[in-house]
Amino acid sequence: LPSRYPNLLVNGTSGIAVGMATNIPPHNLSETIQAIFAVMDDPDITVPQLMEVIKGPDFPTGGIILGRKGIRQAFETGRGSIMIRSKYRVEELSNGKKQIIFYEIPYQVNKANLITKMASLIRDKAIQGVTYLNDESNREGIRIVMELKKDAQEEVILNQLFRLTPLQTSFGINMLALENGRPKQLPLKDIIHDYIDHQVDVVVRKTQFELKKAQDRAHILEGLRIAMDHIDEVIHMIRSSKKDEAGLSQDLCDAFGLSMIQAKAIL
C-alpha cells in the first residue's frame, strides 16, 4: 500500500502460510524514519551504523531486551532471537518487608495467564518467600505487586520468576515478506531499500497522474481561449446549427482547429 511511513516495520506483523511463517516485531516510528533518512544519505551504511539510529524492536508492552547480539543478527540476516525481560522495581514497606512491582511485561504475554502461572508456583512452593500477589493494573498501566517475607531474598525470587514464568521470554524474529510478489527473508536494510523504492514508485505515479490531469485541463482551457477569441462566430455557429451535438462539435473542430474534447467542453 502507498503508506506514508514504513508500516511493516513500525507495526510489525506475524502470520503463517503453507511452509513458511513471518514474525516481524514493531519498531519505534521516529527511529525507523530516521533510519530511512540514514539509508537515503548513505546506501552503503553498515548494520552497526544503522543500529545507532534504530536501536532495535520497540514493543508496546515495554520490557527490556537483553543484549544486542540477537538484534544485530536479525538486522543482518532477517532472522534472529531476542530475550525480553519484564521491568520491575523493588520497594521497601513501612513494616520492613519488600515488594516487587512489575510494570512492563514481554510482548504478546497474556497478563492473566502470567499471574495464574505465578500464583500456581507460589502455591506449589516452587517459589518461596512470597506472602502476597495481586494484579493492580489499571488504565494508567500494568502493575503486578508481589510482597515478600522479611527474610526473603528478592534476587533469588526474581531469578526463579524469570526462569519459570513468561516474565522473561524469547521472541523469534523472522522478517519474511513479499518482495516483487515472491516471499523473501529480508535484512533490515533490504526492507528499508524496498520501502524507499516503493515510495519513489508511488510519488512518480502520483506525479504522472497529476501531470496528465493538468495537461488535460490545460488542453480544455486552450480550447476555451480559442473560443473566446472568436466568441461571436462560435455563438452564431451554435445558434444557427441544425445538427446534433456530435455534428456541431465536428463543425467547431473544422472551423477553429479544435479537438473533439475541446469542442465538447465549449458546448
Regions found by a protein language model. Give the residues of each.
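Conserved glycine-bearing catalytic or ligand-binding loops at nucleotide- and phosphate-handling centers
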Residues: 20-82, 112
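Long, charged, helix-rich clamp/arm modules that form nucleic acid-engaging surfaces
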Residues: 54, 58, 106-107, 130-267
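A common structural junction motif
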Residues: 40, 44, 122-126, 163-169
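Hydrophobic side chains in well-ordered alpha-helices
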Residues: 32, 114-117, 157-158, 266
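Conserved phosphate/anionic-ligand binding catalytic regions in large, soluble enzymes, centered on
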Residues: 3-30, 257-265
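Short amphipathic beta-strand starts and helix->beta connectors
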Residues: 3, 80-90, 124-132
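A short, contiguous, amphipathic alpha-helix enriched in charged residues
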Residues: 103-128
